[in-house]
Every structure is written in structure tokens, then in C-alpha cells.
Amino acid sequence: MSTDQFGLSDGDYVPDPDRDTALLLDGFYDHLAREHGDLVAAMRARHEELEAANRHLIVDEPARHNLRMTLALVAAYELLLPGLGRPATIEAVRVAFVEPLGEATRQGTLAMLDAAPDPFLALVAVSKSREEHAFGKGFVFERPVDDERRYHVDVRRCFYHDVLAANGAPELTPVMCAFDANWIEAIEPDRHGFAFERRTTIGLGGSHCPFHFTRNQD
């Protein structure tokens, strides 16, 4: 079975939100079941309730999948909080969301970058594809720079954060941000010829999330 579950190394990656969300949520609940198996059924039931109550937030097809994914975190958070307390619950949710597909995401990204004639252009293409097909209208993007050497895209509105805030759990937004480390860590500037920088995020208190790809100086 391929470790590249998202198909990143194929060279013509297009997000499949239905597949990708299913993979993430299967890994999320399976991980939680290891230590909190007695609560998983209740988490899933609460997840369905939250989806029904938040359908009005769906603005397009990507938002439908992003809503489902984000509300899984809220459901788990609500069920774990009474027994674990806030810091431990946030950490448990983070680990369950970030780690199950972490290595597969890193390895898939690394394989794509290593195989690409131009790793910078390859990852910029993935970013642009995800902006359109995986994020959609629930996010607002600004692109102050997009040329042969730099692709700087700033997220000015984050659907994940909006959903979490609407459901009383904005403190979970950094969990969503943390998943990106899985692909960010695959970038090796000396090896791939470019660097990536994200100095802050909306979830960490920033006004926006800067995703900045920059080629190395010659």
C-alpha cells in the first residue's frame, strides 16, 4: 500500500476533498479510540449534531468538507474536556488530528519535490490547486507577490477559525495550523532551491496567515 495517500507525488495533484476528509477523520477517530474508546461513539454522535446545526455556514462544496472536518475537533473537544481539562484536551485533539497522516504527508511531499524538475513551481502549483479546490470561498486569499521567484499568499479569512469561533472553540484553531507542519517539514531549502516561511497565523493571534514561498538567492 502506498504511503502517499494524498497522491502528492503523482505530479498532477488535484485535491479530492471527499477522500482527503475521510482519510483525516478515519485517522482522527482511530487515534482517539486508543485511549478514549469509550467516548468515540458519543463523539461521532455529537459530530453529526454539530454538522446539522452548522449547515448554514456552508458556502460551497469545499466548505461542506471543511465544516465536517473542523467540527470533528469540536465534538472530541467537548467530550474530552470534562475529564482532561483544557490544556490536555487541546493536546489530545492536536495529536489525533496531526499525527496519523503526518509521516505520509511528509513523505508524499518530499517525493513530489525530489521528482519535480522545478520543486518551487511544483509546490506552488499544489498550493494554488488547494486554494481553489480544497479551501474555496470560505477562505479569503490575497497574493501580494506571484512571480518566477516568489509566491506569497496571505490568508485574510480562515473558514476553520470562523467555524471554531462560532462553536465556542477558537482555541482549537492552532490545531488546524499545526497540520501544515507535516508538509512544511519536507521542504529542504538547500536541496529543493526554495524556502517557505509562515511567521504567524490567525489562530496564533495574527491578522492573517502568510504562506510565503521564495526561491533561494543565486
Where are these regions (language model features)?
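Short secondary-structure junctions
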Residues: 133-137, 187-194
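Short terminal or interdomain "cap/linker" segment that borders an active site or interface and mediates
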Residues: 142-167, 172-175, 181-184, 191-218
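Amphipathic interaction/junction segments at domain boundaries or subunit interfaces
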Residues: 79-173
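Activation/maturation switch segments at domain boundaries
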Residues: 1-29, 190, 194-202, 206-218
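Short coil/loop linkers at secondary-structure junctions
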Residues: 35-39, 86-87, 170, 190
